[in-house]
Amino acid sequence: YLIAAAGIVLCLVIPIIIRKVRFLSEWRILYGIVGIVSLAVVVVVGRVSYGAMLGFTVAGINIQPSELVKIVFVFFVASSFKRSTEFKDLVVTTVVAAFHVLILVVSKDLGAALIIFVVYLVMLYVATHQPLYILAGLGAGSLGAVAAYHLFTHVKTRVNVWRDPFGTYDNGGYQVAQSLFAIGTGGWFG
């Protein structure tokens, strides 16, 4: 309960601090470096868990830097777009964002990579109002999804389970099938 209480307090206090502290937008380079270094540490010293390198252990405490990086990444992109939305600056920000995603893909943390990618696309659109950037991003994301399907067996397994949860009931489809049973029995609202 102590951790939950601390989390609630942080959720209430941090927005107030962010509104009061204007200099946070000047640390974009620090945000980019912290994000990339945090993810790179996992690639170097991380332990493999269920096929992915998600974190490491220090003094018996499991640390998963990708959770912190999701927040730091938002600060990085926001401060970069506040500084400039000229095309050359967008390219630099996109390269740094792509490096974040690439490190996550190398460590097989595809869920975090997808979150970072989608967050970047949404923030890019909000900052520039250019639908072409969204279309290009969706095209690149589609190519990445096809590549992930062919490169990672666990992605292929998940797609097959999604396509036929009852055919793969004993080999990965159990949870999907049970959720379909629950929806069929109780509907969306139980």
Predicted features by range, described:
Residues 1-175:
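Hydrophobic alpha-helical transmembrane segments of multi-pass inner membrane proteins, especially
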Residues 175-190:
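Oxyanion-binding "anion nests"
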